[in-house]
Each structure stands twice: as C-alpha cells, then as structure tokens.
Amino acid sequence: MEYDYIIIGAGSAGNVLAARLTEDADVTVLLLEAGGPDYRLDFRTQMPAALAFPLQGKRYNWAYETDPEPHMNNRRMECGRGKGLGGSSLINGMCYIRGNAMDFDHWASLSGLEDWSYLDCLPYFRKAETRDVGPNDFHGGEGPVSVTTPKIDNNPLFHAMVAAGVQAGYPRTDDLNGYQQEGFGPMDRTVTPKGRRASTARGYLDQARPRNNLTIITHALTDRILFEGKRATGVSYLKGDAGTGQTAHARREVLLCGGAIASPQILQRSGIGPAELLQRLDIPLVQALPGVGENLQDHLEMYLQYSCKQPVSLYPALLWFNQPKIGIEWLFNGTGVGASNQFEAGGFIRSRDAFTWPNIQYHFLPVAINYNGSNAVKEHGFQAHVGSMRSPSRGRIQVKSKDPRQHPSILFNYMSNEQDWHEFRDAIRITREIIAQPALDPYRGREISPGANVQSDDELDAFIREHAETAYHPSCSCKMGDDKMAVVDGQGRVHGVQGLRVVDASIMPQIITGNLNATTIMIAEKIADRIRGCQPLAKSNAAYFIAGDTPARTSPVRHSLPVTSYP
C-alpha cells in the first residue's frame, strides 16, 4: 500500500489533518488508528453528561499509569488517553478553552517560533469553530467544531459561583475565549446543537469519510516508522488482536499525531530519541534527539466540595431510577441534563500580582463527585475544581522495550518545585474565600473536602499529596523550537530527518493556560496549511487583554471567614 501521506493517530489533531489534506483531490491519505470506531450509538461517548464513563475501562481509554510519583506519596497516578476515532476528543470533558493570548505570545518569543503569536493563531481557532451564537472577531461560524454556549436558564449554582468569584475581588468576563480570559464567567463546550459530543471524528472525519482519497484503518497499532537513511518512508503496524504485521508506504510524509504520550513512544521505537536510551534497548539509532519524551507537562487539580442547602444540585441525576428519563430526553430531544457536560462556568485568576497572566484555573460543577465518576457524595452538593496552569515541574516518557503493546515509563514529577506548593496552598485558600461570599449564602453548607480541620500549610500539603489528580492534559513531550532539546521546528518537522512531522499536543513548548483540545485542533489546522503549501491565514488585528499593572484582585465583599464559621 502506498499513499501520499500516512497519519498515525485519528485523534484531535490527526482527524484535522485527514480532513484538510483530502480537500486536495489529487492527494491520497491513510489514517491509522489503534482503537476502534466512535460508535455513535454508545451513549458513553456521545452523551455529554456521561463523560466519566469512557474513562472507566479500556475500550476507549489507553489507561496509562505513571511511575510512582515521588512528591505525591509515591502514588501511581492515572494518565487516561483516548483510543478510537476522535482520540482524546472522544473521552475528554468537552470544555472549549483555548488558552490565554499570552501563552502564544510567549511561544512566539522563542527562537524559531515567531509565527505562533496569538494573532497568528487566532484565525485558525476561528477557522475550526462554529459557535452557536454566531461569529465575531474571536469566534468562527463555519468550522467543523461545534461549540455551544451556556444558556441563561441553566443551573443556578453556575451563576452563584461566578458571582461569588466576582464578589471575592476578581474580574468577570463574558467570554473565556474572547477579549479577556482572566476572570470568572460562562464556559463554552464542544457539544453539537443536538446535544451530542462534538469530537473531531464527528466534526472533521464526517466531512472527509465520503472522499475516495481517504483510507481509514482502525485497530491498527503502529509499531514503528520506517526509514531509508534519514528519510521516513512508511509505517509498520499491527492489525487487530492477532497482531498481524502490515506495512504502508508514504510518498511524501509520515505525520505522527499520537498525542503527548504515544508520539514520543513511537519516535523512540523508530530510532529517534535519546541515544543512551535507544542503545540500552537495542533500538537502531536513526537520529539522536535528547528531547524526545522530555519536557513532559500536565495540569494537576483538586476538588473543594461543599454540601448544598437547597435541592438544586445534580445529585438526583446520579440516582439510577432517574437516569432512564434523562437518557430518553437526551436521545430523542437532545436536551436536558444529559445534553451538557455540566462544566458551564469557571474562570482564570492570578493568585498573586507577580504573575503576568492567570496561573490558576477553576471549573465549577453543580454536584460533588470525582471526575471519573467515583466517590459521589450522597447528598446535594457542588464543587470547585482548581489547579495551577504553568507548573515549573517537568517529567519524561521512556519506552521500556521494542514491544508496541507495552506501556511506557511515565513520570510527570508532579509538585517537584516549591512554586507548585505555594500555588496550590494559595488555590485552596482563595477558593475558600470565594465560597464564603454572599452569592453562595443560599446554597453553601459544610465543607466536605478537604474539610474544616485542614488549615495549616502542613495539613494542606498532606491533602494535596494524597488527593490531587491529573486534569488529563499531558503535553510538551516533543516540543517545537530550535534549541538542543527541541524535537520539531515551527512547522512540526522532526529535526535531523526528512518526511516526518509531529502534529499534536506534544509539540507545545510550554503548556497553555487551560484545557488543551481546542489548541491541539488549532495547531493541526495551522500546520495543515503548511503541509498543503497554502498561504497562512492573515494575522488577526483583534485587541486582547494584557494585565500589565492591573492588580490581580480588588477588595472582596466579604473577607474570608474561618471555615468553621461559614453561614
């Protein structure tokens, strides 16, 4: 089999490339996906409110685990990644957050990445998006990604939590992806107008599937990339459970879109990576690149949970006897509790004036439950997810063998820098101040977690070590740039070889301020134009917020009360 392009991974980036490259009728594309189809009749991946289910089990989830994390009580921590058409957009929380404008301006300040500024990237965010309330300077109206905005009559806890954030002295913003990310406000989500998950399989592949120049093979696990000298010429993969070896050849390029965990694995198995690691595993060296698998970053988060004095939370939706009605309304009408991911409000703040742009993110949820659906509190409640955005901690990914079925060694090295501890202590204390504001007086009951007795630095640190979780945002493990640890250039081309690019979240040089899916799609849209030889979209001229000397917060309406004294 021979194609112009072979794409490894039908995820958030790979599906974008497959759709855009096959717009050229004379180009042939093979799309390889290790998982199966995105079964449209499986409510677990299609119903937004069922987002916890795909993380349970291994049908749609690679279910990686980290090595024991030394600063987290040596816990082996979850590292879920999507498996199937759509990749992690098939199992994520559907929060449509692009990051802060300053993230991209920081990227553009790095050598070789000058065209990755916010105003360079904004046109590609707009190209990818169709927002339900229409386009403007920041949002698109004709893209494959369906973006739904929260409606005014949604759960009152969303409005109360945003109001409480403002009363605590932080800004309000009407659009976390618009002029000003900083502040509290409504949170957009990747959900269709009919209440279905808007994965990249639904948005991009559905457009491309009818084209004769696209071939999609599922249950195809990539073993390694093939080379002739320094040129990538094809892919060796295993088909199905039997593991029958297959080979496909690429006339032009191999495009690696495996994500931040799989892409460095595949490069290392293919002979591209740290020379000492490859030598130890008897993998023939094609190109020594010490940065492959290094610079690994993620977002860590915690939940602060509270009981709710009024029966307005989503707790009844967790009871089995209420779920058939919810499912029927969603299935036939695309409405109701099932049609939302229930992350409809949140925010970004600076915990201290020293930060140039937000370093803390909030997701508000009108129920008290773990992200993966476990440990639901058996009463009406709500919670704030809170975590730091740009931790200085760095991890790494290393293959353990040549076997493509063996999971790699993953170490994020969470909380390995003193700044991490300062930020998380600040985050807990600030959250308590927010929850103490008058807007939540009608709803706020007792603090369930961490609990009123957790107050000192040592007590907070113990809670963080035991309870902080991944936000499922691994990135930066094949970073772009031109320094000695960079893996790809600003167009995704792997240094030192020809005919090979990496296009996914792994090429971010630094993690962004927020959820990764929207930015991963943007990266693929931008590089797709490069691959096709298209003129880049014209830079935006939209104005955007820069904090400058603006204080991180103003005086709160109510200064923090002792946790035991909440009304």
Curated annotation (Swiss-Prot):
- Presence of keyword Disulfide bond: no
Q: What class of enzyme is it?
A: oxidoreductase
Q: Which residues form the active site?
A: H473 (proton acceptor)
What reactions does this protein catalyze?
A: choline + A = betaine aldehyde + AH2; betaine aldehyde + NAD(+) + H2O = glycine betaine + NADH + 2 H(+)
A GO MF term:
betaine-aldehyde dehydrogenase (NAD+) activity
**Cofactor(s) named in the record:** FAD
In terms of InterPro entries, this protein maps to: BetA, FAD/NAD-bd_sf, GMC_OxRdtase, GMC_OxRdtase_N, GMC_OxRtase_C
> Which controlled-vocabulary keywords does the entry list?
FAD, Flavoprotein, NAD, Oxidoreductase
Q: Which residues bind FAD?
A: 4-33
Source domain of life:
Bacteria
Gene3D superfamilies recorded for this chain? FAD/NAD(P)-binding domain (3.50.50.60), Glucose Oxidase, domain 3 (3.30.560.10)
Indicate whether Oxidoreductase appears among the record's keywords: yes
Which Gene Ontology BP terms does the record give? glycine betaine biosynthetic process from choline
One Gene Ontology cellular component annotation held by this UniProt entry = membrane
Q: Give the Enzyme Commission number.
A: 1.1.99.1, 1.2.1.8
NCBIfam families this protein is in?
A: betA (TIGR01810), PRK02106.1 (NF002550)
By sequence similarity, the record places it as follows: Belongs to the GMC oxidoreductase family.
Query: So what does this one do?
Result: Involved in the biosynthesis of the osmoprotectant glycine betaine. Catalyzes the oxidation of choline to betaine aldehyde and betaine aldehyde to glycine betaine at the same rate.
Q: What is this protein called?
A: Oxygen-dependent choline dehydrogenase
The protein's organism comes out as Yersinia pseudotuberculosis serotype I (strain IP32953)
